[in-house]
Amino acid sequence: MARTILRARRFFSLILPFFFISSVYAEQTSVPAKTVTVEAKNETFAPQHPDQYLSWKATSEQSTREDALAEDPRLVILWAGYPFSRDYNKPRGHAYAVTDVRETLRTGAPKNAEDGPLPMACWSCKSPDVARLIQKDGEDGYFHGKWARGGPEIVNALGCADCHNTASDDFAKGKPALTLSRPYAERAMETIGKPFDKASRFDQQSMVCGQCHVEYYFDGKNKAVKFPWDEGTKVEDMEKYYDAIAFSDWTNPLSKTPMLKAQHPEYETWSVGIHGKNNVTCIDCHMPKVQNAEGKLYTDHKIGNPFDNFAQTCANCHTQDKASLQKVVAERKQAIHDLKIKVEDQLVHAHFEAKAAWDAGATEAEMKPILDDIRHAQWRWDLAIASHGIHMHAPDEGLRMLGGAMDKAADARTKLVRLLGSKGITHEIPLPDISTKEKAQKAIGLNMQQINAEKQDFIKTVIPQWEDQARKNGLLSQ
C-alpha cells in the first residue's frame, strides 16, 4: 500500500512544472524576536520524536574524513591564497557540522572573540543555534564580528530547529512543520519567485534543504550571507550578478585573478536535473519513509546515499535493479571526474603562465581579458565540482559547465601564449612539483607545520573553554 501511495505521488509530481520566476531582491532587514525562543538542543525533541531523533543521531556513523586535497593536489594551486588551499575534506554526517567547522584549518586558530581570519557567517549552516541567535539579536547582530565570537554560542550540531518550526502546534502533533529558519534564505526564495508560505509541499521539502545546500557569498561590511540569485540560479546568471557588483572572494596570488569560490550548490544544480524538473525532492531520495520496529512509518533522518535505502528510494520510481542503476551513476560520475581533471590541468597551467606574464612586465590592461577568462573558467569548474552529487542530480549540467570551463581556460591560455610571445618568452612555462598535497602547499608558500601546530593548540585549549561556557549558560546538555 505504501508503495502504491508513493507511486501515485510520483505520478502527480511528474506532471507539475518546475520553474523559476525572477523578482526584485528584498533588502536585508533585522528580524524582530518571536514570542517563543528557538530551542537548539536537539535531544529536547527525542521523547516526542524518537525515531526521527535516533536516525538523525545515526549520522554520527558517517564519520570518515576524506581529504580532497590529498586526492587531488591541483586544488591547492587553484585555491592558492584562500583557506581552502590549507584544508578541504569531503562532507560527512550532519552530526559533525559543528565539530568540522571548528577543526578545519580554514577557520584558523583564533585566541579570542576578535581574532581569526573568517566572519561569523561561517557558522550559518552548522547549527540551530544560528536560528536562535538571529531570533535573539536580529541578522545584523548575529552577523557582526569574527567567527570566534560565536564559539561559546553555536554548540549544537545541525538538527531539528534548522528545518522544523519546533515551537508550533503542528510539530507538537507530529507533523513536519517545515520552515525556513534563515531569513536570508527566505528572501532568496522570494527573489526567484518561490515564497515559502505559498510553495507546494514538494517545493518546501527541497527549499528547507536549500537553506544550506546552495551557492552564497558574504555581503557588505557585516559579511552577511546572501544568495546571488538576482539574475537567476544558473552558472551564467550568478556570474553575471557577481561581475556586475565586481565581487570576488579572494585574489589568487599566482595569476592575480580576482576569484569566485563556489560553495555547495546542490539546490541550483538539482533544480535543472531530471529529478528536480519532475518534483523528485531531496527528501524522496535522501530521507525516505521507513518502518520502525512496530511497523509505523517515519521519515529517516539519517541523510545519506539513496542506494543504501534502494527499496524505499530509487525503486519507488525506477524499474531497473540496484546494480544496473549503480552502473549508470558510476559511468556518469567517471565522465564528470575525467573532464574535471582535464579542466584543472588547464587552469593550473593558466595560473602559472599568468604569473610568468606579470613577471615579464605585462600591464593590467594586457592582463584584464586573460584574468576574466581564468575567473570565468574556474567559476564554472568550481560550481560543477563543489556540488558533490552533481553526477546524480544533474550530470548533463555538470558536463555543460565543465565544457564551458574548458573553453574559457583554453581562451585564457591562447591569449597568454600570444602575450608571452610579445615579451620574448616562447618556451613552455614549467610547473613546480605538485604531485602531492604537501608539495603543492609548499609551492604556494604555506607553512603547514606552523598552521597545523596552531590549530592543534586551538582545539586543545579554546574549544573546551567554549563548551564549558555553553554548559554554564544552559546551551548544551550537561
Swiss-Prot record:
Location in the cell reads: Periplasm
Tell me where it mainly resides: periplasm
Q: What Pfam families does the entry give?
A: Cytochrom_C552
Where along the chain is heme c 3 bound? H94, C209, C212, H213
Residues holding Ca(2+): E215, Y216, K261, Q263
Stated family: Belongs to the cytochrome c-552 family.
| Name listed for the protein in its UniProt record | Cytochrome c-552
Name the source organism. Citrobacter koseri (strain ATCC BAA-895 / CDC 4225-83 / SGSC4696)
